[in-house]
Amino acid sequence: MSETYAKRLSAILLDAVTDKDPQMQEQVCGALCDFGESKPAEVLSACEEHLRLHEKLAHPYRTIILRAMEIVVSNHISELDKDTARAIILLASNEMTKVKELVSDWQQAASSVLVAVGRRFISSVMEELLSKFQPGLLPHPCTVHTLASLSVSNVFGVVPFLTSILSTMLPMLGAAKHDSMKVVFCCALQRFSESILEYLANLDQAPDPTVRKDAFASDIFGAYDILFHQWLQSGGAKLRLAVVEALGPMSHLLPSEKLEEQLPKLLPRVLAFYKKHTETVHVSKSLGQILEAAVSVGSRTLDIHLNSLLAALHAQICVPVESSSPLVMSNQKEVLRCFTVLACCSPDRLLAFLLPKLDTSNERTRVGTLQVLRHVINAAAAQMEVKKPVILSSMKLPLLDTNNKVKRAVVQVVSAMAHHGYLEQPGGKAMVEYIVQQCALPPEAEIQKLGADSEALAADSVRAISVSTLYLVSTTVDRMGEVLWPYLLEFLVPIRFTRALSPLCRSLVHLAQKRQEAGAHAPLIQYNGNVHLPSPYAITTRLLAVSSHPYVGDGRGAASLRLLNVLHQDIHPALGQRWVTAIPLLLEHLDEYSEETLSQKEWEEKLLVFLRDSLAVVSDNTWVCHLTLEMCKQLPNYNGTPLEKNFLYKCVGTTLGAASSKVVRKHLRELLETARYQEEREHEGLACCFGICAISHLDDTLAQLDDFVKSDVLRKSAGIFNLFKNRSESEANKVRSALILCYGHVAAGAPRELLLARVEADLFWNMSECFSTKVLGIKVETQDPALRLSLVQSVCMATQAICSSAHSSSFHLSRKAELVAQMVEFIRAEPPDSLKTPIWKKAMLACTYLVTLEPALEEQVQADLIHSCLHRVMAVLPEPEEGDSPQEVSAAPTVGGDPQESLYLDTVQVLKDLLTSLLLWNMTPLGLQVMLEHLSPWIKSPRGHERVRAVGLSACLLQFFLQHLQISALVPFHNLGLLIGLFSPRCADLWPATRREAVSCIHSLLYLQLTCVGFSRDYQDDVAEQLLSLKDGLVHPDPAILFHTCHSIAQLIAKRLPPDHLINLLLTLFESLGDPDKNCSRAASVMINCLLKERGNMLQEKVPEIVSVLRSKLQETQEEHILQAAQHSVFALATHHCASVVSNLLGSPLPFDSHTCTLWRALALEPGLAAQVLGLLLEKISKDVLFEESQAFLLSSTPDRVATLLPLAATCALHEVASAPASGPAVLELYPQLFVALLLRVSCTVGVQPPRQLQAKERRSASSGLASRSLEPCSSAVDALQAVLVRGGNEDVVQCMELDGGWQLLRTSAGHEEGVTRLASAMAKFAGPRLPLVMKLLFTTQSSMYEVQRVTSTAFLAELLSSNVVNDLMLLESLLYNLMARQKDTSARVRRLVLHGLANITLGSPDKVQTHSPQLLTAMIGGLDDGDDPHSLVALEAMVGLARLMDLVDAWDLHAVLLHIAVRIRPFFDSERMELRSVSIGLFGHLNKACRGDCKDVFLEQVVGGLVPLLLHLRDPHAPVVTACRFALRMCGPNLECEELAAVFQRHLQEGHDLHFGEFLNTTCKHLMRHFPDLLGRLLSTSLFYYKSSWEDVRAAAPMLTGFLVLHMEAEQRPQVDLEQLLTALQLLLKDPALKVRLKAVKTLGRLVKFA
């Protein structure tokens, strides 16, 4: 392409620089850079020319262009010729110095261009710069700045010029008047000095290795003299800081004698800057360079100023470091660098200065000093070697500091000391102890109040640092092994180091393993008289105790066990083999669980088994005695951690179990004397200890307890005057409580063969003695709740142990009645309506065990026990949640938390066990009735939570009774009807749980009856089993479903209830009509009516009385069970006067009240009568006018449709009749007529208003404040249709429609068609046999005068074709014929539905498509050409239908119309309507799919024509269009005869995969240009059409397509491209309002470089 084009393209891009959006400017810059990649010289020339010709272009835009030039130059410096470089140099120089004012971005960009060119053309750049750097004239600041930058970027090129530059610059320094210019000179001198130093440091690579520092010394000193003596004295803050920055590197170039001469003045001046500037990092950096220079020349001046230097630097290091301030952090690094220099030259004076600072109490001073000390220990290790003792001794006071920041700094110093051998010195162990102390810090000690300038320690706590330091030192510093082992063992046992146990154990394990590797058989712990080391017994006790809660303290349980395992040889030589296998199993158990999931009880049992096994392995009484002594000795250590202390008590008991009797007696006595009885939490541990010990030493244990009970500890004086001489009553109660608990645990642990003989005399008697006291000889029972709980728990444990004995059945407990009475008293004494302690649960559990023992309880005692337990448990209030309905309130108690809720559930379970235990004493129907009579008041309670609990208990009792009933002869079950009547109404309780349990009760009662009459226990009764299947229906909140289920239950009861029980059942149900739960009352009514229907022939003389009662109730109430009774009278009347009754009822006011509705439903009780009624109602609906049109207002433009009264009333009546379950046969008889009439009724009432008189009635009701049920014509028709479907046995249709929202759609104008479609689909699926007659009637409505009826019938018939049922019923031909006959209907809606129906044949009868393919294709193409549909909906349906037919029609028929279809649908690709776009593009994909045969060549033209729209609409704003494009392109691929392109489409366009559009388009264009180079022009011209698309994303995609096509085209394809047209279009896009479009246009312009 010509040079003219390259210039024009560059000009377009350069013109676009002025876009206001920064992203656009950056994109233009990028495009220029892209252009420059292939044509660097042309782009640079164009930029140079643009800037030269557009002098008035604003400097921000000039900056963008200069930046692009810099990038191009940097990337292609090797390709530039001298002329281009010269032009660029002149331009950049001119841009840089065009204005005298400083414009940073613009001038910096120009300077950067010069620096970039200078990397290769240094001579030319220097020539230009030096031309503006003339002696005697002050240069432009940017000239100096550029020289400085060049000296850094091209050291070897610039340094040879620096001698002349410095000599020229030196006189200029005096001429500089403004601080800004002086700052530039300072920066230049700094950079020049740095360049010289780098040059000198790399002389071996330098072009002139003869260059020496002396060559610059004179000029540098001259400059130094001006900077230091003039500018530093009088300049502003910014200038003074620049001077200080320059003096650092300059000091290295000063002559040695001059530097020594200047240091006395230089150092104080530099240090003074710390007080004047906030950004001190530059001062510190320069000071470090000066100090290094001074040290390098051996200056003595440093000694004089050392104190001031140290003081200033120390003040800097003590500045608080803010983590968000990198400048402060950098300053600290530079200051520490200065300290390193001073430490190397004056270590003694440095330490003399630093170490006294550690004694100060100031936080910042101490932290800063420690920071410096750590640094010099690491950085100047050689100089500090001889100072170790001094440094260690200076740490005494910091070790006592409680400040967290100081602690952290000390830990860091100790870490450094450990790595450099300090801790091996005397005093080093104190440092180790300090680290361990910090590892043991409690959480509260780590949290300090943070001030405004304080550092947060939350993320980097002292403890965390200490833990990591301890482990690091233990594992990585080899020399620390001798220091830490065995010293760290001393910290295991003291309680204050508990929190450090986990890191301690980890370190000790590592150290021990290393020592084992060094000497495998040598003992690890060498005591050698070291009294501070813990004994093996102390170690074992401590590690076992803390392992009881293994996840506390960073998982110290696992760490402790691992240490035990490593130390097994030192604990006892015999333990090795056992522990090597046992401890890993314990660790595996911990790995399998977490703190939340681990069972604490199970874990403690595992540890006790481990201890017990270890004791058995050792089998050494002396060792066991020592271990026991140590455990008892450590018990007081755990006073602050009661859970661990309780476990240690268990360990003591376990150890005593392996000891001799003498040892047991001694230690048990000591435990009793030293126990902290005032701490109730310790009682359990002490009792467990005695219980475990009793397993092996029952006599000794009981003896010690008896001795202690008889001692003075519990004795109270008989005299009133001595009452106050003994310990307080409260303390004594706590002792007695603990002792009672001990007796309980002893009973639980005692060998069962010894227990029965001792339980009454030694256990229960002593418990009683401990529980009561005597005052003046009178036995007084305490009211202390803790003491009561202890007694209850102990009785419970003792009775449970008795029951678990093999001889419990023959054991006679003489104190049984007394104990039961005491438990009942405790239960009654607890506050009602709440559950705060486990006394109820434990007392009832004790009674449960007691009940099973001989002798039997008296009836009154049983009754009192049952009443007390029920009264307490049932009355606990539930906990309502906000927004809960009564049915949703939980039966859980109001106890506020999961532990209490669990306690309640456990209590209920215990109550069930207690009642079943009592029932076992009288396993007869009478005994069952007595038990249920106790529950009866609760079953009928007005409080729901009490009912649900009582019915649940009843179900449990009945199930238990059924399972344990032993029948040796036929036993009459006299109270069956009474009991069924008790539970039956509960099947409709407000609480779902009550309903389910009630069904379970009835189920059990029916099986009890069967068992009593001789059926075997495993007999399965079909009727009884059906009850269980009805439970699901009881969960449903819909009352209709609920009571229908109750009706079903009553039917099942009626089938199995013996005749002589029927009247008792009915009388009981009559009583339930007054049940406080209205649901149960209604359920009783439903069941009464069902029983009368099913078994009324047996109660002939009772029927009139029953009906009379119900009719009288009808006048008093609206309740359902009363209304049901009235139905019989209406039924009798209607059997004789059907038409008259119907006519009179139709005259009832609308909407019908409940009385009228009940009476209508009564007419359905007999199928013959119901058929007559339905026939009359159909006549009323069909024969009268459906609606009237009238104008509500005179000025109304469209008349309102108002329903006529008689058809509306008939519809409502039909709904009521069909709603009755008994109307089913009649509905089935008239099913087609009812269905069609109601469906058409629905269609004609959509949007129709109620009759005027009804509207007036509603308004009057509203104005008077009375609630009135509104009557909506369409809803009434839908309800009637639903009722007909249900009664016709098509509940599945109703449910399907309900789930799909079909009923709601039927009621709306917008969704009516869809609703009809869903109804047809449901009918085809669930009611296929009904369709032939329904279709026959619908065919007759196809010519209805009402368009809505034609639409409805067509929609229904059309949907039927989607089901195979029409084919199975041989209705396909007639249905197709009927639909095709409606293609010319005047209604576009009908025509559209016809096409939809014809296409549905692909779903219902795909095998018939080929047979009818000519007619189907003709109909669809006719739809494409439908000209009477302004919205193209018919055409849309035709395209949808064609897409569905495509794979099934005859190939020959399809090929004949393929081209016509493709041409016809092409205009819809770019339709404004999303549906037309998506469907037409999808159909195009199907056409391609069908065209993979012989018609490829014919169809290729259409594929090529659609390729660009398909690619661009992948960016369509609507997802369905994008999906259609993906499919169409995948189908087009094979027709393009390019395997690579087809593979790309398949790989990138799969559904569900994210599409990277740019990558995909790039790959597609690459293959298009490779295989179809001749299509370039056509593709480009088509893409230009979309530059004007109304969719922003498509407009943005169009230039992308253009760019990628151009990117991949070859040179020989250039004639196909109309560059003029393309550039013009892209120029227009650069003005597009959408930023993304402009960005893509610029990107494309950058790719047009191929034409340049």
Swiss-Prot record:
Keyword Repeat belongs to the record: yes
Entry's Gene Ontology cellular component terms: cytoplasm; lysosomal membrane
Subunit structure: Homooligomer; homooligomerizes at lysosome scission sites.
InterPro entries xrefs: ARM-like, ARM-type_fold, HEAT_Maestro, HEAT_MROH2B-like, HEAT_type_2, Maestro-like_HEAT, Maestro_heat-like_prot, MROH2B-like_N_HEAT
Similarity annotation: Belongs to the MROH1 family.
Function comment: Lysosome fission factor. Recruited to lysosomes by RAB7 (RAB7A or RAB7B) at scission sites and homooligomerizes to mediate the constriction and scission of lysosomal tubules. May sever membranes by inserting amphipathic helices into one bilayer leaflet. Lysosome fission is required to maintain their steady-state number, shape, size, composition and function, and to accomplish regeneration.
PROSITE patterns: HEAT_REPEAT (PS50077)
Cellular location(s): Lysosome membrane
Protein name, entry field: Maestro heat-like repeat-containing protein family member 1
Gene3D superfamilies in the cross-refs: Leucine-rich Repeat Variant (1.25.10.10)
GO molecular function (one): membrane destabilizing activity
Name of the gene this protein is made from: MROH1
Pfam families attached to this UniProt entry: HEAT_Maestro (PF21047), HEAT_Maestro_2 (PF23210), HEAT_MROH2B_1st (PF23221), HEAT_MROH2B_C (PF23227)
Placement of HEAT repeats on the sequence: 3-41, 260-300, 344-382, 385-423, 1369-1407, 1410-1448, 1616-1652
